[in-house]
Structure formats: C-alpha cells, structure tokens
C-alpha cells in the first residue's frame, strides 16, 4: 500500500456517480425480479417490466457500471503494478457477457420460453445488456 492522498478530481466524482447509478440499477433490478417471482402467478413467467423492459439483464449492467465507477475513482492514486487492478471491470464485463451470467441465463431462458411468442418478441426488442427505451 501507499500513503498517496489526492483531492477528488472530476474523474473521481464521475466514478462516484457511476458507482451510485450502477448500484441503484443493480439493487432495483434484483428487487423487481424478486418481487415478480414472489407472486404465484409469475412462477413460470419471465419478467419484462420495470428495468427488465429496458434490458434483459439490467442487474448485470448495474454491476458492470459500478465496477467502472470504482476504477475511475481509484485511477488517480494508482501507479506502477497497481494499475493492473484496472483490469477488474473489464474482467467482470467479459465474465458476465461471454462466460457465465448472460450466456448461461439466455440459454436457460431460450430452453424454457423459446416457443413463446411473447418471449420471442421480448428477446427481439429488448437489448441483452445495455438499456434502451422500450
């Protein structure tokens, strides 16, 4: 560790804002999905309301956003080998979009609801990760 202290710059404030937005999106999406699944009538349905109308995986978008925010906040005080830590948000993005997370959930959803016209339209019109107005 080092004893480097610096005043928070515009980059740090941007990092804080991204972290707060990302955290809020992730928690809100998780809460919306939990509330949806808690209702018996939704037991075998997919969620397509709230943040889930904007993205098929808004919780992962929030997760990625908050880690980019942490990196921006930390960047001004990192040096040398510490800069390797900046790979973290890229790794989280890669992991969630290419390895686990989205690919696994999409395969499971396709198997479960792939024959549903509503699901086919939802998947066609709703971005996988980056939100877009429905």
Spans of model-derived segments:
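Hydrophobic transmembrane alpha-helices
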Residues: 1-32, 37-134
